[in-house]
């Protein structure tokens, strides 16, 4: 199992940098960011026992705050995935820690803050969301950093500082330095000054672990029964499944797997097990953030555009939506892992990739919702005498979708920030939020099935191009 951290480091750093060492990572920094002076005085010293040197990344860059300063003020970033490595003497009472120290040939002050993410995959998403925030500091960010410093190393007072690392995850030390360079031996500037040392976690099992298991198991059973009851009810109804019903069921099935079922399966007695955090992280990233998000986006798209509810669709549209879902899942999984490499190498494609990412994450669903509302209102004016009931249902569904979007962007986002260090509470919030969505949408889709019980014009056979001769004039294309 001791080989596992090395395998994980290869995965993490293959997406963030192609270098196998700190020197290799610095060589890939664009010349506009590369500094050959004081910024090279902050680097990394791998701990031989931990074998951590080939999976850390140090990136220096020039800060615009040093234009009128008598001493050079340059920024630095230092990122890596810290995990627990069992010490040779078997002592498990000490947690891992990061020890940072100024070199002997440095006079000045280094100020920096610590950023932490439990999952390296999620950290990549934060990087692309913020446009490479961890590889650059602007004026506003530096001012905020100065007000809430974690560490301030002063060569006249203290050259060394140790930060305890109590949780596994992706750590970034981001800050700037005010140093005066001294003449020294050739090649000494490239020597590392930051030391990372490891000890295993305390193996005591949390008292609340059994209670958490019971809660996640209860969520899994209750949500599974709700989805099963709803699926049987739809299948046994007089009408066949509609497209939006299929999309809703697929999304909620993956939601159950990604949240309560995952948490129940991977809640183990031994928190020192290396494989579990990595499996949970991969499970959430590829299945949850990729497939689950794409399926939820597909459900919202088909609902707001009225396919299967207020208008007829076709075999080509089903194929188009399938390809769109695959494309979104691919983008969500791959883009955050490719973006750091493009950003560090100075490629112009990094900006294009981030624009596509921002559009898909923040603009796609609002634009689709607005387009669906415009088309439905146009259809309402055109088919006023035949569309009253369906229009009222669609308007209510659209209002609920907008309400849930507001909840996700404002209320739920603030709750996530409030409990950002409590992963269990965050999972509870996500599970409850997803369950409320499913119940609300399943209730709203019920009246549509009753409307189409007699003329089976919106059955799944129609979606596949198999018509039974019935045709609803209110569902003509417009």
UniProtKB/Swiss-Prot annotation:
**Lumenal-side positions:** 20-214, 262-289, 339-356, 413-427
Provide GO CC annotations from the record: endoplasmic reticulum; endoplasmic reticulum membrane; Golgi apparatus; Golgi membrane
Localization terms from the record = Endoplasmic reticulum membrane; Golgi apparatus membrane
Alphabetically ordered keywords of this record: Endoplasmic reticulum, Golgi apparatus, Membrane, Signal, Transmembrane, Transmembrane helix
Could you list which ranges are Cytoplasmic topological domains? 236-240, 311-317, 378-391, 449-478
Its membrane topology: Multi-pass membrane protein
Q: Where is the signal peptide?
A: 1-19
Going by the entry's taxonomy, the superkingdom of the source organism is recorded as: Eukaryota
Q: Transmembrane region positions? A: 215-235, 241-261, 290-310, 318-338, 357-377, 392-412, 428-448
Grouped into one coarse class, the protein's main location is: endoplasmic reticulum
Q: What is the official name of this protein in its record? A: Uncharacterized membrane protein C569.06
In which organism is this protein found?
Schizosaccharomyces pombe (strain 972 / ATCC 24843)
């Amino acid at each position: 199992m001791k080989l596992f951290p090395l395998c994980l480091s290869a995965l993490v750093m293959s997406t963030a940098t192609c270098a196998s060492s700190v020197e290799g990572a610095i060589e890939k920094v664009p010349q506009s960011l590369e500094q050959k002076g004081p910024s090279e005085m902050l680097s990394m010293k791998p701990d031989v026992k931990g074998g951590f040197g080939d999976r850390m990344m140090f990136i220096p860059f020039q800060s615009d705050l040093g234009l009128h300063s008598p001493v050079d003020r340059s920024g630095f970033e230092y990122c890596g995935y810290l995990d627990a490595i069992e010490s040779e003497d078997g002592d498990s009472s000490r947690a891992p820690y990061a020890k940072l120290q100024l070199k002997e040939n440095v006079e000045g002050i280094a100020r920096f803050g610590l950023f932490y993410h439990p999952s390296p995959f999620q950290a990549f998403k934060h990087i692309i969301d913020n446009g490479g925030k961890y590889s650059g500091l602007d004026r506003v960010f530096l001012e905020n950093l100065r007000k809430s410093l974690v560490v301030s190393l002063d060569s006249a007072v203290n050259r060394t500082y140790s930060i305890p690392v109590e949780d596994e995850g992706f750590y970034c030390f981001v800050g700037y330095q005010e140093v005066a360079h001294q003449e020294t031996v050739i090649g000494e500037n490239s020597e590392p000054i930051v030391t990372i040392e490891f000890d295993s976690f305390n193996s005591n099992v949390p008292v609340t672990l059994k209670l958490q298991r019971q809660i996640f198991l209860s969520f899994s059973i209750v949500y599974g029964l709700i989805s099963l009851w709803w699926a049987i009810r739809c299948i046994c109804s007089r009408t066949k499944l509609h497209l939006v019903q299929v999309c809703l069921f697929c999304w909620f099935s993956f939601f159950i797997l990604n949240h309560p079922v995952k948490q129940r399966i991977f809640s183990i007695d031994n928190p020192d097990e290396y494989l579990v955090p990595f499996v949970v992280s991969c499970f959430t990233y590829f299945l949850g953030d990729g497939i689950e998000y794409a399926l939820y986006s597909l459900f919202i798209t088909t609902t707001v555009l009225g396919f299967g509810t207020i208008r007829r669709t076709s075999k080509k549209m089903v194929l188009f939506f399938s390809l769109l879902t695959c494309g979104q899942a691919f983008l969500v999984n791959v883009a955050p892992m490719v973006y750091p490499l493009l950003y560090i190498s100075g490629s112009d494609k990094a900006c294009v990739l981030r624009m596509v990412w921002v559009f898909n994450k923040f603009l796609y669903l609002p634009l689709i919702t607005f387009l669906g509302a415009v088309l439905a209102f146009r259809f309402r004016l055109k088919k006023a005498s035949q569309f009253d009931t369906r229009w009222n249902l669609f308007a209510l569904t659209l209002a609920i979708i907008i309400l849930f979007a507001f909840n996700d962007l404002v209320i739920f986002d603030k709750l996530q920030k409030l409990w950002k260090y409590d992963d269990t509470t965050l999972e509870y919030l996500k599970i409850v939020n997803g369950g409320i969505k499913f119940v609300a949408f399943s209730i709203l889709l019920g009246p549509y099935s009753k409307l189409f019980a007699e003329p089976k014009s919106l059955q799944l056979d129609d979606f596949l191009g198999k018509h039974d001769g019935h045709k609803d004039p209110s569902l003509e294309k417009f």
